[in-house]
Amino acid sequence: MRTDGRNNRELRPVHIQPHYIKHAEGSVLIEIGDTRVICTATVEDKVPPFMRGGGKGWITAEYGMLPRATEQRNAREASKGKVSGRTMEIQRLIGRALRSVVELEQLGERTVWIDCDVIQADGGTRTASITGAYVALVLALSKLVAEGKLESLPVRDFLAATSVGIDPEHGVILDLNYSEDARAKVDMNVVMTGAGQFVEIQGTGEEASFSRAELEELLETAQLGIEQLITIQRRVLGEQAALIGEKVEQEGKSE
């Protein structure tokens, strides 16, 4: 039994509250255990200069933490005058992950800005950001469909992320909180689609190595968690969930 009473393959309690920010085209508050992240999606009718004239859209992300999202206060990066390497890595991860399940050509020359703001951190902030940002993105693009700006929802599959690790005492565990992450021999972030395809795997040993068998167990455990997260996403999105992949399926049948 883990310190918070969970079994090895159990997620922390997950809650996704949609339409959390009234001004954003899409927004959620995602809570996974004591980790809480506000995710918003903003649509701009333009693309970065390097994409102009190409007929494709773009999805990019920004990520940040409130100073007291953590146990000790961390100064805002704006006050330091630069973005940390960790923040840059997470921003790129979120953007890459979301672009993997969106038909950018169908989006047209629009940019969707994803903003993930961690208001309380207890492990898994980047994976919570991806899982919440996906819902915010679908809400924003669904609004464009409702307004007649898009013919159909340009999202071909679901997307979610979670963490797994190898605990010195408990072995392979799912959805690490901060204390578990700090003592894990191996920790890994996994991003997957609803079809069970991998989008990203980030795994490292901390003064330790791991075997192929352990890797397979880590990935299997992550997939179990991600399937549960996608079930929650479906429930939150309601009728909009049925539209995901619809255009892609129709095009496949017509070929």
Swiss-Prot record:
It catalyses: tRNA(n+1) + phosphate = tRNA(n) + a ribonucleoside 5'-diphosphate. It comes from the Bacteria. CDD domains: RNase_PH_bact (cd11362). InterPro entries: ExoRNase_PH_dom1 (IPR001247), ExoRNase_PH_dom2 (IPR015847), ExoRNase_PH_dom2_sf (IPR036345), PNPase/RNase_PH_dom_sf (IPR027408), Ribosomal_Su5_D2-typ_SF (IPR020568), RNase_PH (IPR050080), RNase_PH_bac-type (IPR002381), RNase_PH_CS (IPR018336). Homohexameric ring arranged as a trimer of dimers. Phosphorolytic 3'-5' exoribonuclease that plays an important role in tRNA 3'-end maturation. Removes nucleotide residues following the 3'-CCA terminus of tRNAs; can also add nucleotides to the ends of RNA molecules by using nucleoside diphosphates as substrates, but this may not be physiologically important. Probably plays a role in initiation of 16S rRNA degradation (leading to ribosome degradation) during starvation. This is Ribonuclease PH.
